[in-house]
A protein has these predicted regions:
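Core segments of cupin and vicinal oxygen chelate
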Residues: 12-53
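N-terminal beta-strand motif that seeds the catalytic metal site of vicinal oxygen chelate
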Residues: 1-18, 74-79
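Exposed loop/turn and edge beta-strand positions of beta-sandwich/beta-sheet ligand-binding modules
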Residues: 5, 40-42, 50, 73, ...
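Mid-chain, well-packed structural core segment of small domains
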Residues: 70, 77-85
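A short, acidic/glycine-rich surface segment
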Residues: 32, 40-42, 61-67, 100
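Short amphipathic alpha-helices within nucleic acid-binding modules
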Residues: 22, 85-90
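Vicinal oxygen chelate
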Residues: 1-2, 45, 88-127
Length: 127
């Protein structure tokens, strides 16, 4: 088996409209397709610079998940940005709290974390 790339990332949200606004209007992802499925509500396919796809799902009453970055399972999603400082200012201007900017001791690159509307940890890393 040979894996070429990550095909998509699936995220289940508790408030579809709030999460849609966050990923589309705040983070700037492009809507590829929005589908309503009566038994499971919405599925939103999002694109990041023509390369990656995030599937945003809404289900009736999804159970909560442990969101600690150190818990088993998916730790966080990380996105590359040109400028950490500009990105943090933008997020803060849009009422999204960010952690203090840190420097990775191995790569010497700047990074920080913030959270989506369902408390999923998201990281931005400077290019």
């Amino acid at each position: 088996m040979f894996i070429n790339k990550i095909h998509h990332i699936a995220i289940i949200c508790s408030d579809y409209e709030k999460s849609k606004n966050f990923y589309v209007n705040i983070l700037g992802f492009k809507i590829l397709k929005e589908t309503y499925r009566s038994e499971r509500k919405y599925k939103l396919d999002l694109e990041i610079n023509g390369e990656y796809q995030i599937e945003l799902f809404s289900f009736p009453n999804p159970p909560e998940r442990t969101t600690s970055p150190e818990a088993r399972g998916l730790r966080h999603l990380a996105f590359e940005v040109d400028s950490i400082e500009d990105s943090v200012k933008y997020l803060n201007k849009n009422n999204i709290a960010t952690e203090p900017i840190k420097i990775d001791e191995i790569t010497n690159k700047k990074y920080t974390f913030f959270r989506d509307p369902d408390n999923l940890p998201l990281e931005i890393c400077e290019k």
